[in-house]
């Protein structure tokens, strides 16, 4: 019993002294679960987007709602370098290597989220609509493994470039 108490004290002591993982903040571009309105221009994830991308996403969101009643949400937009690095570090921990993690999360130096040139759209029906109809607004799905990742990659009404297999391929 005494040794069990010692172990319990050690475990509780370690738990209390462990530092919590840093959390992202809205000023870093963190977006609440479920996403935010693409019209929330006061949120850094929207405000810091490239203006042409922001306008195209807002126009597409209006059309998706009018045509199909789809409520498009931005689940990720602009991100600070710090937040992007945190996401990459978490992905490395989850997937075991930088090479595997980069298939889903790019480095801050290469991320189009950091440069304000990409948004992730949700929920699934909205991501699907943007993937199929977004080119009307110049918006394109970029990665085959991320239907939600959208960039301004053509002229309105133009043809989207071929999909890249994943973020590491670009």
Question: What residues fall within each predicted segment?
Answer:
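Secretory targeting and sorting signals
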Residues: 1-21
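Cell-envelope/glycan interface and biosynthesis
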Residues: 21-170
